[in-house]
Amino acid sequence: STEEVYELVKGYGEAARRSMEAVVDAVEIHMAHGYLVSTFMSPRTNKRVDEFGGCFENRMRFSRLIIEEIKKQTEGKIAVLARINSDDEVPGGLDVHDSAAIAAYLESCGLDAIHVSRAVHIKDEYMWAPTVIHGGFSAELVEEIKRAVNIPVITVGRYTEPQFAELMVKEGRCDLVAFGRQSLADPHMPKKAKEERLEDMIPCIACLQGCVANMYAGKPLCCLTNPFLGHDAEPLKQAETPKKIMVIGGGVAGLCAAFVAKERGHEVTLYEAGEKLGGNMRLAAYPPGKGDITNMIRSYIHRCQKD
């Protein structure tokens, strides 16, 4: 009902106030991916006949009231961001021209920065971006939204190469780049990039197996390329008595066992019967769109060879 919408607006403000009391610097309102606020914005899903439906301003009223309520309850002491779609990717949904207008409107409502994602759940290949979708796949759409506003624009969408992310900012196509799954694979990636240690970076191969699949299953996140995910703050226990260790088999499991033992202080020799390392994962990289798997193999080999 209309009354319930106003109750929801109040709830957003109260949540932001609690966040401020917990000493956060900013809050982000989720207005993307077909979630609640997003459904008000789109004429495809908003069929209301009250003041929250119909024309553009009515469909944006919920968003505007949320921003105003958050600003009121936090007294403007924290930044307010919003995440929107660049394109819903469904017939009758919002396209990039709609989203540019939405971004400009949100700026006029007092928004401090805008975070641009893409697609709704029924077109979720553009939400999760598996390996068949190239990195930075929404760059052109983000650029169009950037031209419509003066506030900082954040882009997201399978950015795995820091060189490309840096280029996006340098060329003025966005102001910041968000790293999601790549931060799970390697939370130290920005530091390594700054120090020009690109070979040391652990790649995200967009397999979705340990992150998105586990999220939907209600399980703890894990990562195929980063076996230490969730234990990053725990130092690798050094061996009290270093040993000479022989690892037989140069597939990814053998490579991982070898570099972990090496990093614990053991002297490790890796044996592989074939001519090349990587095992069956090399075959897995051959189907179309699966080439990024070789980045994982290359990373593991580098960790074994590194002094």
Where do the protein language model's features map onto the residues?
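N-terminal glycine-rich dinucleotide-binding loop that anchors FAD/FMN and/or NAD(P) in oxidoreductases
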Residues: 201, 284-307
